[in-house]
Swiss-Prot record:
Reported function: Decomposes hydrogen peroxide into water and oxygen; serves to protect cells from the toxic effects of hydrogen peroxide.
Residues that hold heme according to the record: Y362
Gene transcribed to yield this protein: katE
Protein name: Catalase
BP GO terms, sorted: hydrogen peroxide catabolic process; response to oxidative stress
Active-site residues, as the UniProt record annotates them: H75, N148
PANTHER family, per the entry: CATALASE, CATALASE-B
GO molecular function, one term: catalase activity
EC number, UniProt record: 1.11.1.6
PROSITE patterns hit by this protein: CATALASE_1, CATALASE_2, CATALASE_3
Domain of life: Bacteria
Family: Belongs to the catalase family. HPII subfamily.
Amino acid sequence: MSNEREMQNKKDQQLESFRVEDEGKKLTTNQGLKVSEDEFSLKAGERGPTLMEDFHFREKMTHFDHERIPERIVHARGFAAHGEFQVYDSMKEFTKAKFLQDPSVKTPVFVRFSTVAGSKGSAETVRDARGFATKFYTEEGNYDLVGNNIPVFFIQDAIKFPDLVHALKPEPHNEIPQAQSAHDTFWDFIANNQESAHMVMWAMSDRSIPRSFRMMEGFGVHTFRFVNEEGKAHFVKFHWKPVLGIHSLVWDEAQKIAGKDPDFHRRDLWESIENGDYPEYELGVQLISEEDEFNFDFDVLDPTKIWPEEEVPVKIIGKMTLNRNVDNVFAETEQVAFHPGHVVPGIDFTNDPLLQGRLFSYTDTQLIRLGGPNFHELPINRPVCPFHNNQRDGYGRQTINKGQVSYHKNSLAANTPQPASEEEGGYAHYQEKVEGRKVRKRSESFKDHFSQAKLFWNSMSEVEKNHIIEAFSFELGKVQSKSVQQQVVEMFAHVTSDLAKPVAEAIGANLPQSEGSSVTKSSLALSQENTIKKPDTRKVGVIIDNGFNGDEVKQVLNELQSKGIQAEFISDKLGIKKCAGGSEIEIDHTFLTGESVLFDALYVVGGKEVDPSFKDDAVYFIKEAYAHFKPIGATHVGIKWLEEQEIVEKEGVVTGTDMNIFSQNLTGAVMEHRHWNR
């Protein structure tokens, strides 16, 4: 679908000039010379030595030897898509950013989702924060909102970032473990850098094992500024709210998917867009006037703190739709360069010390990863508006600048290109008053590390709290150092003993004495139990064999599909299965290739005469789906299999002989996502 579309926006039109279709063409060298042979190198005789004059071999091999570029130090494993953003109403009251003014304007975007810790080839369903980086191609230049799916971070000052990443990455003496935080150095860092407490609570929650990129929130993490035409500023935090709601995997399921389909999240995103089920996210902002900066019990500049939505409501201002897959992952997803310093008039920075460090680091890392200062000229990074300056030369330069002048000020070119006034669209930094002594120290207002960690805990449902306890128990159970284990338990005892004590018992640590923070506040916005629940794009595995009731299956599938639910057929063999009346269904997966963990729900149909091995495989699927709290529907022989497992009357298990009622009940069960009360 994505390769057979009309040009959708200015960015798509720009990229079209760089796209190349090789199918049906003659093979050439990079110099355009047609090649007559591509299977054998040039040799002196059939069994003789290869000749150095074989320019085609040398070009082909040299290019191959240099195909790889350094992967990102963090966020190496990522996948991306194109789309568009549209503001709902003008935000003129708060910002002069043009792309936030006109509801009729669609701004092209490019969004890259990623894990943080793992290498480029690591699994996607690991426990980890997820990157959520958006590049807006606006008429005023590129604006990058470089965020995560968690609204806070581990550290407050960017100078600690190398230490955090060194601790999180595989341990250097043996390069183990990959894409995991369950090891000694990470938890040693956490215990000795207790500002991380709030972020760790999020990381140990279900937020760090999302069901899909389409079902996770995004956050700008930092505090930025909106500045309007009059020069008035507001502190702002950015939120992406998924239209499908916020949903997660369970931990056992996530680990199994990592082995069964390490590309699970990118496959889900790719297939959704190819099927026309375009992911949608609403953009929300929290706004605090500068006059109210000190009216809260948190510092608005602290990146380890949220602004609770009950205190600072999220104003929904627009929607982003991802509607086109990339044409080439390397050229687009791998070579895209995000940078929080890519801003437009009306959006400015604050003194968040983590943000300030990122403003240096992102440009610096692109220089080595993309080979020099001209990464902005790569097709995916080019703005859709013209750019003119006196930057010249360097590796990979593509622009051919005409004229003799490449400096400012000048008279030979009438002092052009010349700076634009603020009225002409020139970027003017917000005139913040700054004063103080040069010091290396933490603000007193940054020193409360546990209150919001307790707020997060208070906001969780009992199920979510149990998942956090289990996650801590798993992670610390992998830690070899008893000292580190004990330090972490004592650290989180300052949050709540309701967490620290069961974790201590699980790993054999001494029970902590602290009862934890006295904070009693909670926030409904933090629990996934309060999220939107929709059946759209859920995937149901239909276990089926020859002799099934064709009319009943058709009726059920029609109901599921009318609600946007997708069905895929699973059996013992690929090929065709026939119903009792003769109609046919083509099988999508065998029991070997389609695991229950790859589906949101099961619909167990069976068949007229099922052999024992088919039943054994079907029952395995049923048991695993049930253990992962997934909806299960069954008819006919499927009901018997559920009865044998004594789960027919359990929540989220749907049976029946009236197909109208059965179909509606199964749809409702699928919409709930998980059924925890069983």
